[in-house]
Amino acid sequence: MIWNWLRKKKKSNTSKLNETDNQEQHSNNQEDDNKEQTRSMKHNKGKNNEQKDSSQDKQQSAKQGDSSQDKQQNPKQEDSSQDKQQNPKQGDSSQDKQQSAKQKDPSQDKQQNPKQEDSSQDKQQSAKQGDSSQDKQQSAKQGDSSQDKQQNAKQDEPSQSKQQSSGGNSIYDFTKPEKDRIHSLQNLIEKLKKSSDFVNYHTSDDETMPYWISYYRPSLDGEKLQKYLMPTLLERPNASLEELKEHIPMSGITITNDLQKIEDMVLKGHAIIQLNQQDQKCMLANIAIDNYRAPTPPLNESTVIGPQEGFVEDIDTNINLVRKRLPVLDLQTKEMIIGEFSKTKVVMMYLDNLAEKDNVDFLEESLRALEYDQINDSAYLQELMGEKSIFPLYINTERTDRVTKALIDGKIAIFVDGSPSVLLTPVSYFDFFISPEDYNVSWMYATFSRILRLIAVLFSICATPLYVAVLNYHYELIPSDLLETLILSRAQVPFPPLIEALFLELAIDLLREAGARLPMKVGQTLGIVGGIVIGQASVQAGLTSNILLIIVALSALASFITPIYKMGNAVRLLRFPFLAFAEIGGLFGISLGFIFLFTHLFRLTSLRKPYALFYPTRQQSVKDSWIRFPLTMIDTRDVQARPQHVKKAAKGISTKHRSDFDD
């Protein structure tokens, strides 16, 4: 029926065309509409050619108008319907004009006057009757340009839709689809019941009685449930949730209808208690297991003298250990959750009257901006916060006394739930060579120990490269007596010094890794026996010289002298690029390597503070850096952290002659 109506409509329009032949001048004024209609002409090129040949006869054009327009209407309507389906969002003005020219719906025909209908028909005929070649070429070019524009618009459409769908969210889009979203407490419980270790049951066989309990069975502390929670529920069957909260002898009980809070708490070991199964309001009781490892001596930072108290995996226990040592009101904490899946609890701790405000704000902003699936240890935060150097920019410690000392100096501590290590920032290069034991011995021995550590690090980096450089380029620097011994030791070695040094260095690293992965007693035995056997056998086999074996062994021992384990890893790793520099340029190559090393150290920053304290020089920090002054003379805090108050209390008893005691 619609097709018949369109045909009748077209017939009435063609009858009016015979009366308004003089209005063909409107076609020149409406070139834009003609350009837009060329797209349909290009698709129906064969049909248009026939229509152009027949249009030369004015009398036949009136008779054949119905058939030609009816034939043309089908592809036009099909094209317009396809364009609408493909481009539902491209409602620009040019396409509106095309659709209005292609589809003359009844509503538009009723609103437009006969003159407008006549002019539209004239426009169509003028587009169809373009006999000149110039008009044909222009229409073809314009049709191509219009198609290109439409294709570009179609190509831009998916990118715009992607941007709109992302909505400016992070790269980790965990938005749940509408069907998976939780709209009620019952939906949440049904989703939790998909896990086999989730329990949901009624406390009574009578369905009319109250109290439904839901929890995860592995996280259940049976003593809390049977001794504190269940007796109160059974004794008060008609009590409300508020009354139960007052009578249950447990702490941390909350009443809420917040679905997100309920989900977070039940995943942490809380139990859901409902009066009725259809209630949206519930009570949350903490029945999780609280048995954690007790504080033990730190394994990676052992000392002979001083406290032997180390952190554990429970973050609340670690914070309590620090608060026990610093019972002051200014000790503040800021808590946040990091990890898209792990939901790891991270806490910043600092002294509000000492820590610089800019440091606190910048670190908090950096931590909250982190996005990662799982945070298992504090070392994850070190790398995620931009640690790209082989040198650690955060001190990773297990000792409570080191953390309290850093907090008093104005630094910030970062606790991670599940990790026994605490991060300290900002720090300098010399902080990694300071041991907590230095404050428990005399200042002279502490100074000697710190200088010895720095010399040991320098020896560990340079000893083997110097051996390679001297044998390759500077053998004239070796004394004649030592040169003869060195020549005899290398007489049977078939390899160059570089290959010989790499063989022993890699052998030492293999023994170290194997000893660390094996059980403690087996690892110690393997390190001692393996080192002796492999070293003696390699010398007898002529694979290496005994002098280089001694140098490599001393270098390995020197790398273990650093109090912080990660700094020792950096020192051991530096030996290999220095070996390459020594092989290429001798002593000049080693000097070039140190230039690169110091340039890198000068560029490093820890929490936007200079990492290498020897440049720029800070005289106030020298008292407790690579040397240690007596405690009474260390009257200023470490300026590396820019504390609010630099001066600190440092007053002792004078040892001068006092007449009242001596007499």
UniProtKB/Swiss-Prot annotation:
Residues 57-72, 88-101, 122-150 have a biased composition (Low complexity). The chain crosses the membrane at residues 414-434, 451-471, 491-511, 541-561, 578-598. Residues 47-56 have a biased composition (Basic and acidic residues). Residues 1-13 have a biased composition (Basic residues). GO terms for biological process: spore germination. GO terms for cellular component: plasma membrane. Keywords: Cell membrane, Germination, Membrane, Transmembrane, Transmembrane helix. It is found in: Cell membrane. Residues 1-175 are annotated as: Disordered. Signal peptide: none annotated. It is a multi-pass membrane protein. Belongs to the GerABKA family. Required for inosine germination. This is Spore germination protein GerIA. It comes from Bacillus cereus.
